[in-house]
Amino acid sequence: MFKKLITTPFFSPNKQFITFQLESGKRNYFSNNKIQLHGGSGHRQPQVTKVAIEGIKNIIAVSSAKGGVGKSTCAVNIALGLSSHNLSVGLLDVDVFGPSIPLMMDLKNHEKPFTNELNQMIPLQNYGIKCMSMGFLVNEDDPIIWRGPMVGSALEKLLRQTDWGHLDVLVCDLPPGTGDAILTMCQRVPLTGAVIVSTPQDVALADVVRGVNMFKKVEVPILGLVENMSYFNCPHCNESTHIFGNEGAKNTAKKMGINFLGDVPIHLQIRETSDSGKPITVTQPDSPQAKNYKDISKEIIKQLEIINNDENKDNKEPNIIIT
């Protein structure tokens, strides 16, 4: 009898391909043995070790499967919202090709980061948030033309060669989609969980489903879904209009069995404060819009507490057993 245990990587293998290879091997070397393919589960053995970052308690990814839904604006204000709940917070701009954090955190014209005696970069800081971005290291108008491995290497340096100090939460603003940068973060970084940002319309929500399933496949917990640009309040009559549809993200979250963290309206001051590098959570902390972000941040804190206190969390992934 020929037996072997194979642990799968993050995605399920092609059973037909494995069966074909094994049958070929049997004919050549094990003609008198029987080969069987069984599904099973065992302890997680990832291909790439996820190494914790000293001093950082939680790392959360803010993601959107589709661009243009206001993810970076949400990431910035979520970071500031977490900080308003007396947490020490960092903000990492994972979008190497189109960094937004320098502008939104009013660090666009700041000098480049210094390094300490250990050759670690000192993160730039504003509004009490430690920030790191590729936008701090290159000229604003210079394009970054890199292939996947270079992106992964750059992200590792931004993340691990930065002197973050002590952080309760590091918020990572991911680029849209499910490309190299996101896979690097999921496979190499011990993410506590992911926050998905979407607008309410069907064309955005279809991508949300794919994004959520991607995080599930790489075993990153989903902290919840945020509905951005949820509605518009008329400044003259105060009537609410759901321009992109009503509660689309909330209903999607319910169908997928994930948490709905809250919604944020379309509002002129959110756009203006973001473009000027003076986020509304800081400049207008008592406004209804700032309260939306703070409430979402409070829900995220609750989810982080649940994950961190769950001693029975399932860390297993499927294996293939060949007997």
Curated annotation (Swiss-Prot):
GO terms for cellular component: mitochondrion. Its cofactor is [4Fe-4S] cluster. GO terms for molecular function: 4 iron, 4 sulfur cluster binding; ATP binding; ATP-dependent FeS chaperone activity; metal ion binding. GO terms for biological process: iron-sulfur cluster assembly; mitochondrial respiratory chain complex I assembly. Keywords: 4Fe-4S, ATP-binding, Iron, Iron-sulfur, Metal-binding, Mitochondrion, Nucleotide-binding, Transit peptide. Signal peptide: none annotated. ATP binds at A65, K66, G67, G68, V69, G70, K71, S72. The keyword Transcription does not apply. Binds 1 [4Fe-4S] cluster. It is found in: Mitochondrion. It comes from the Eukaryota. Iron-sulfur cluster transfer protein involved in the assembly of the mitochondrial membrane respiratory chain NADH dehydrogenase (Complex I). May deliver one or more Fe-S clusters to complex I subunits. Belongs to the Mrp/NBP35 ATP-binding proteins family. This is Iron-sulfur cluster transfer protein NUBPL.
